[in-house]
Amino acid sequence: MNAMVLDDVIKSQAGYLNPYILEERQLNVTQLDVFSRLMMDRIIFLGTQIDDYTANTLQAQLLYLDSVDPGKDISIYINSPGGSVYAGLGIYDTMQFISSDVATICTGMAASMASVLLVAGAKGKRSALPHSRVMIHQPMGGAQGQASDIEITAREIQKLKKELYTIIADHSGTSFDKVWADSDRDYWMTAQEAKEYGMIDEVLIKK
């Protein structure tokens, strides 16, 4: 059995506390940050806003885990306010592309683009802790400059809106029209309400 203890030093990078652990193996002791250690158990954390860096990291982790053990489940724990739609769609497409089922678990908040990733988990393997919140809404964006440039941006936002609502409707089983209407403004759901909406399959309660 591996013995693991919390390291005395917690490394701080860009204001984010990244704890390290010491993993004691038969022949040596290896220092790992806790997220890397969890990834060895096929657990990935999405605990920040979704941007290009986050998306690149998550996509790389998904592709790596799928390559070392194709078909074995991967879990993504989500506590995120959302972020870039383009970056999030990159994560979404990777989740659908790999052969491994991706289980999604909301551990606090899955809002905006993060809610799309939550509902995109493998059917029957999407869950949330009891006091989690899920929020869907229409994509936001701004434009300035010439009228033609503003029109181009507006058309793109409408395309993204339809694309995101289609994804939510397909994975949740809720009608496209209802998703469209509900997302006109911020639409917040408790864990139980998210289950009834089809965003998750189970509310996790300790037995």
Swiss-Prot record:
The active site is at S112, H137. It comes from the Bacteria. GO terms for cellular component: cytoplasm; endopeptidase Clp complex. One of its GO terms (molecular function) is serine-type endopeptidase activity. GO terms for biological process: protein quality control for misfolded or incompletely synthesized proteins. It catalyses: Hydrolysis of proteins to small peptides in the presence of ATP and magnesium. alpha-casein is the usual test substrate. In the absence of ATP, only oligopeptides shorter than five residues are hydrolyzed (such as succinyl-Leu-Tyr-|-NHMec, and Leu-Tyr-Leu-|-Tyr-Trp, in which cleavage of the -Tyr-|-Leu- and -Tyr-|-Trp bonds also occurs). It is found in: Cytoplasm. Its EC number is 3.4.21.92. The keyword Cytoplasm applies. Keywords: Cytoplasm, Hydrolase, Protease, Serine protease. Fourteen ClpP subunits assemble into 2 heptameric rings which stack back to back to give a disk-like structure with a central cavity, resembling the structure of eukaryotic proteasomes. Belongs to the peptidase S14 family. PANTHER family: ATP-DEPENDENT CLP PROTEASE PROTEOLYTIC SUBUNIT. NCBIfam families: PRK00277.1, PRK12553.1, PRK14514.1. This is ATP-dependent Clp protease proteolytic subunit. It comes from Bacteroides fragilis (strain ATCC 25285 / DSM 2151 / CCUG 4856 / JCM 11019 / LMG 10263 / NCTC 9343 / Onslow / VPI 2553 / EN-2).
